[in-house]
């Protein structure tokens, strides 16, 4: 690169100094300086998805959109992120615009519902104002809005059935995101917007699918995740879960268009052991010979379900395999697996008290 004139450099430094005095430290910087740090992330609770995102989870200080058809696992993924944030000592806010949050299911996924901040707003404006107030406090690590489609503008709620309200929701989202984007970045909070799919009428070529709430969220989101249910997991005659595929359709912090596949088990959430088996085989850390799965000299079991069960019963083996995979992808290592739901913790506390 050509050398910049010394007088120009001095002028730039003086200008930057004045800007920092006026607007605060970090308001302007050179990209090559140490002040631009690596992007921190919070794990999604799914090893394959953490790898697909490139930085080991969803980026802090950014907006994330999770969208897909009904019952594909969007809220489950958001709740897993909430649980991971709480494990690190973070605070989580949940704007339940759909009025459909199931606390017992959230507890099963590892969410500390006692300390989860929940709001069930009456209007879209109220929901987004509450979200902004929580983010502005600087104490919230993750804010989840479930869902954009349920953020109904006040005019629509107060109006009559059949009234036309074209573009109201899109305008509301555009205005809210303009206000939120800067605050989210400054407070290093992750804003997760869950969104639904709609069909565009009269589309001949390309995908007729679109998300609700206009185009603003597509632009402001640093990460967009397309969640699809691709198969059902059967045990005997009953269905016990879904096979889910996520495509990273937009990623501003790592290469996009990567995919992750995993099991979501009913009342349990993402199957960690199933994910370790799948990724382990893909990375050749777990060997598959016929129907048998093995890790070094350890035989995990015949068939995937038996291998999953072995890892459930032997968490230290699962941890060892997971850390090898994480090391290979330069992701932070796991210290220990503590998978106790708040119900189990409460049960233990009650037992201890009764023993006393």
Curated annotation (Swiss-Prot):
GO terms for molecular function: ATP binding; ATP hydrolysis activity; ATP-dependent DNA damage sensor activity; damaged DNA binding; single-stranded DNA binding. One of its GO terms (biological process) is DNA recombination. It is found in: Cytoplasm. InterPro entries: AAA+_ATPase (IPR003593), DNA_recomb/repair_RecA (IPR013765), DNA_recomb/repair_RecA_CS (IPR020584), P-loop_NTPase (IPR027417), RecA-like_C (IPR049261), RecA-like_N (IPR049428), RecA_ATP-bd (IPR020588), RecA_C_sf (IPR023400). Keywords: ATP-binding, Cytoplasm, DNA damage, DNA recombination, DNA repair, DNA-binding, Nucleotide-binding, SOS response. GO terms for cellular component: cytosol. ATP binds at residues 68-75. Its main location: cytoplasm. Pfam families: RecA, RecA_C. Belongs to the RecA family. Can catalyze the hydrolysis of ATP in the presence of single-stranded DNA, the ATP-dependent uptake of single-stranded DNA by duplex DNA, and the ATP-dependent hybridization of homologous single-stranded DNAs. It interacts with LexA causing its activation and leading to its autocatalytic cleavage. NCBIfam families: tigrfam_recA. This is Protein RecA. It comes from Clostridium botulinum (strain Alaska E43 / Type E3). The gene is recA.
């Amino acid at each position: 690169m050509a050398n910049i004139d010394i007088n120009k450099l001095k002028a730039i430094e003086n200008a930057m100094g004045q800007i920092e005095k006026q607007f605060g430290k970090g308001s302007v910087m050179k990209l090559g300086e140490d002040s631009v740090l690596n992007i921190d992330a919070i794990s999604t609770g799914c090893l394959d998805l953490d790898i697909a995102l490139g930085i080991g989870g969803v980026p802090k200080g950014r907006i994330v959109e999770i969208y897909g058809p009904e019952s594909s696992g969007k809220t489950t993924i958001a709740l897993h992120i909430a649980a991971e944030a709480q494990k690190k000592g973070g605070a989580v806010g949940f704007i339940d615009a759909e009025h459909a949050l199931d606390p017992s299911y959230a507890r099963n996924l590892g969410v500390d519902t006692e300390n989860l901040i929940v709001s069930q707003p009456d209007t879209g404006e109220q929901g987004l104002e509450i979200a902004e107030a929580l983010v502005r406090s600087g104490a919230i690590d993750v804010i989840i809005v479930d869902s954009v489609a349920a953020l109904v503008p006040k005019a629509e709620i107060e109006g009559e059935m059949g009234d036309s309200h074209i573009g109201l929701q899109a305008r509301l989202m555009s205005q809210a995101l303009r206000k939120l984007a800067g605050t989210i970045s400054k407070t290093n909070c992750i804003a997760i917007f869950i969104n639904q799919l709609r069909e565009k009428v009269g589309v001949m070529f390309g995908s007729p699918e679109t998300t609700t709430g206009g185009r603003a969220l597509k632009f402001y989101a640093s990460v967009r995740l397309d969640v699809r249910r691709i198969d059902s997991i059967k045990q005997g005659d009953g269905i016990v879960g879904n096979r889910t595929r996520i495509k990273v359709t937009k990623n501003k912090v790592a290469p996009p268009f990567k995919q992750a596949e995993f099991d979501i088990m009913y009342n349990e959430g993402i199957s960690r052991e199933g994910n370790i088996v799948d990724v382990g085989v893909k990375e050749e850390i777990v060997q598959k010979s016929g129907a048998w799965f093995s890790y070094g000299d350890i035989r995990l079991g015949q068939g995937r379900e038996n291998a999953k069960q072995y890892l459930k019963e032997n968490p230290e083996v699962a941890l060892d395999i997971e850390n090898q995979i994480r090391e290979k992808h330069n992701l932070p290592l796991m210290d220990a697996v503590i998978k106790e739901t708040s119900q189990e913790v409460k049960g233990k506390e009650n037992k201890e008290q009764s023993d006393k």
